[in-house]
Amino acid sequence: MKQYEVTGMSCAACSARVEKAVSKVPGVTSCSVSLLTNSMGVEGTASDQEIVNAVVAAGYGAAPKGAKKEQTAAEEEEALKDHETPKLRKRLTASVIFLVVLMYFSMGHMMWGWPVPAAMKDNHVAMGMLQMLLTIIIMVINQKFFVSGFTSLLHGAPNMDTLVALGAGASFGYSTYALFAMTGAQVRGDMDAVMGYMHEFYFESAAMILTLITVGKMLESHAKGKTTDALKSLMRLAPKTATVVRDGKEVIVSITEVRQGDTFVVRPGENIPVDGIVLEGSSAVNEAALTGESIPVDKQKGSSVSAATTNQSGFLRCEATRVGEDTTLSQIIRMVSDAAATKAPIAKIADKVSGIFVPAVITIAVITIMVWLLAGKDIGFALARGISVLVISCPCALGLATPVAIMVGNGMGAKNGILFKNAVALENAGKTQIVALDKTGTITTGEPRVTDILPAEGYTKRDLMQLAADLESSSEHPLAKAVMEHAKATGISQTAVHDFQALPGNGLSAVRGEDLLLGGSVSYMKENVTVDSILLDQAQKLAEEGKTPLLFAKNHICAGLIAVADTLKEDSPQAVDELRDMGIRVIMLTGDNERTAKAIGAQAGVDEVIAGVLPEGKEAEIRKLKEQGKVAMVGDGINDAPALTRADTGIAIGAGTDVAIDAASVVLVKSRLRDVPAAIRLSRATLRNIHENLFWAFFYNVIGIPLAAGVWYPVFGWKLNPMFGAAAMSLSSFCVVTNALRLNLFSVHGKANKDAAPAAEPVEIKTSESEEKVMTKTMHIEGMMCGHCEATVKKALEALPEVTSAEVSHEAGTAVVTLSSEVADDVLKKTVEEKDYKVTAID
């Protein structure tokens, strides 16, 4: 997707106009305009010039991003800086100064008798001329509203500035007419008419409208600037210089001058400038800036390092492998920025409304004036109602409702190592009903390790490990690697062997000194060595637990048994529990045999295990699961790319520095399964925030426009002064943006944000754990529409003495109830249905 910078947009109607204009360009397949970042993403074959011309023809400006060969992070950060708020603050200060003077003469003197210069006293024409002059000054200060508003109107695409310009202009125009009419009456000596026209002045309304809208614009601009804080903080991480080796000398150069293949050095305390490979030295590197992981990572020769991470202890000499826009940091920044420029499906309704909103409001204002005139009201009353309609209506609140929440939610994710590639992914993740987890590398560490050492009579554990290490030292098998790593960790050094053979039937043999060493699977060893029945029973039990038992012998006498297994990640059980507590069904996909798979599944606590699935078969399983609900597939993005692509949400876990995984729509930088429920939780919070924003934006306009038009005046006598309408409009967008900023306070790990319990050294199934688990029930509920519904159901359920807690989700339509003691399903059902929701099932 090609990115463009767009200038001149002031509200949602503007972005809708630009999007519509560019979408009509031949060759454009899709176009997405972001009012928040003043950017546009375009896909298709149309040239840059054709796209820019379309934007210019619509009345705005555009230029391709990165028109320069390469834009530094500092320049990108500068582009994101809030340049608008300082300008608005100056405009507001000047406007307020002249408005205070205007209000003194227009209201203070008339209502409270405040003193005025002698030349003005009882000189109504002079007072009117002064008010007109002060209003003109304020209009000139805020000329942007008129230039933008009427330019857009001439292009057939009226925007929010058009409403402000028409409202303030109508107030000023009618007041100017009244001033000239009053002057004529003064000349004729008709003092009654003079006093009547004095009350027809709306100069202060025109000035107040412009000033209050500027207040709102400044507050909105400041709040919008806050939404890009996460992106700007990422950009600040980028080093500005690097120390490279040129002609054998160390030279400090700009980061833009570093090229792939350059040798650079990093001393303790310095940030690593670009991605690279360590050529010399060792150190501990803090990668928290990229991964959020606070524990430093040891680096040595051959290790990879990433830009913006901090060298803490040693001297490193490295070779640059990825520079400029190819570094991990640049990819993350681009991913976050591109996601902010895309649109979520939920925004479509707001976009449709924004496209016709301003013309509809102008029409309503004209009809309002005509109706009140036909009803017998004077022109001043009718005009005030029409102006109120113009200035209270706010398309910006509609246009900002979705993008500000997407930007803040996406930034929160990036800070926590959760990268959403686009707004669609951020929305879809929250709708997940089923999570399919790949086993190897996702639930488990992906690296087999020794879990049990059971020596035969006459052998110690160390004797057995020494024998196994000597035999396995010449093997390349993954299980041999696990044995060797355990031996190294326990301080066992290998003794040289010769005549090593890998025998048919999963067996090994070698000669150590004069002793023949044998090792291998139970079936192989039973045929070659006499094995004690107790060891065979233990081997059977270990196999049932998903472990691989290996027998070892010396001179055909069994020395004992060592079990090896791919062990669970420490946080896997907790992550699965969190997903289930959120009302999500958890399934494990694996190519392992059913016995091993079920053992691992039981340890992790998943709802279902699908075993014997080859990598190419995972996609078919995901296709089947999608028939049952929205599916998120979690894998490493290597051998499960088709499954990740097929799922509604593909989540790649443990990406580390390789964040550009094409198959996944969500990338988890850390190899931490708890980030999966965190991503879903963040998505749900963002969706909830969008719903709140859209509700407020629609509710505000639906309530405000009829009130401004005077619909309730005949019944209750309610009418709205245009100045109060302008005040309401100025605050509406600010409220939407401020509500989105609340996401910055959201904890992605929620109540579960505590350290995961460390896994025991031997990974075993403890049958007693299933009996000790707290009882839970999942209720399927229809009728919940929002966060308020969730709170109502949660409060009702938790009022029951047997209920410890209730986790309610209106998106999933579930309530997961944790019970301290048994409670009848009928009681739970009645409790919820008394709140006017329907319970369809209880699991």
Residue ranges and their predicted role:
Residues 26-43, 48-49, 200-201, 232-326, ...:
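Conserved cytosolic catalytic loops of P-type ATPases
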Residues 87-241, 352, 717-722, 728, ...:
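Transmembrane helix-loop-helix hairpins at the membrane interface
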Residues 1-128, 233, 249-252, 334-342, ...:
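Flexible metal-binding regulatory segments at protein termini and peripheral loops
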Residues 76, 182-185, 190-193, 207-268, ...:
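Juxtamembrane coupling segments of multi-pass membrane pumps/enzymes
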Residues 90, 309, 433-476, 506-587, ...:
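ATP-driven catalytic headpiece of P-type ATPases
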Residues 16, 29, 430-432, 512-514, ...:
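Conserved ATP-binding TGD loop and adjacent catalytic N/P-domain core of P-type ATPases
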Residues 111-125, 154, 173, 412, ...:
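Membrane-embedded alpha-helical bundles of multi-pass transporters
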Residues 290, 349, 384, 397-471, ...:
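Conserved catalytic phosphorylation-site environment of P-type ATPases
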